[in-house]
């Protein structure tokens, strides 16, 4: 079973992000807009209850987090991915760190760059065309997210499904 942890924003911000993703993100139908807290990790089916309990314990003391999407950015030249950058806060970093150590299904492969992906799977030409448009449009959105979402990848439907949400203090 493949799981992941994410912060999922309000419906209104999901709609704003999805207005780009529908056009520019080939993964659009697989998952809602989100900030990844724990990248996909694999567990045995029988370990799900244990993972749920570990998540509950690890979020203890973490307050609801402010998410501030500040501008369009990209992972170029490493990757032709365009995203809305989220300002990194101590609370966001703490949440990420609690789930990305050897004691919870391994360390993160990448440095924590909180963001909402809006375009991926682009050719270099597509990237150049789209990035300019998105950067000009800009973004400045703040909201409080008070739940951490545990997701499971459903192979049959080829998409991520919510298993459980956990209230942040």
From Swiss-Prot:
The active site is at residues 34, 115. A motif (HXTX 1) lies at residues 34-37. It holds the Pfam family 2_5_RNA_ligase2. Belongs to the 2H phosphoesterase superfamily. YjcG family. One of its GO terms (molecular function) is hydrolase activity, acting on ester bonds. Keywords: Hydrolase. This is Putative phosphoesterase SAOUHSC_00951. It is an enzyme of class 3 (hydrolase). Its EC number is 3.1.-.-. PANTHER family: PHOSPHOESTERASE SAOUHSC_00951-RELATED (PTHR40037:SF1), PHOSPHOESTERASE YJCG-RELATED (PTHR40037). A motif (HXTX 2) lies at residues 115-118. InterPro entries: 2H_phosphoesterase_YjcG-like, Cyclic_Pdiesterase, YjcG. It comes from Staphylococcus aureus (strain NCTC 8325 / PS 47).
């Amino acid at each position: 079973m493949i799981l992941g942890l994410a912060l999922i924003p309000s419906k209104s911000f999901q709609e704003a992000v999805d207005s780009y993703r529908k056009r520019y993100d080939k993964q659009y139908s697989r998952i809602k807009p989100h900030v990844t807290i724990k990248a996909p990790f694999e567990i045995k089916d029988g370990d799900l209850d244990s993972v749920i309990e570990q998540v509950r314990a690890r979020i203890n003391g973490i307050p609801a987090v402010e998410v501030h999407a500040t501008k369009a950015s990209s992972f170029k030249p490493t990757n032709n991915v365009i995203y809305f950058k989220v300002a990194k806060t101590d609370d966001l970093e703490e949440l990420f760190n609690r789930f990305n150590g050897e004691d919870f299904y391994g360390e993160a492969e990448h440095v924590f760059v909180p963001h909402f992906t809006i375009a991926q799977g682009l050719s270099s030409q597509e990237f150049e065309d789209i990035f300019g448009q998105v950067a000009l449009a800009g973004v400045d959105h703040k909201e409080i997210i008070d739940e951490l979402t545990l997701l499971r990848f459903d192979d049959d439907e080829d998409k991520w499904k919510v298993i459980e949400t956990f209230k942040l203090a």
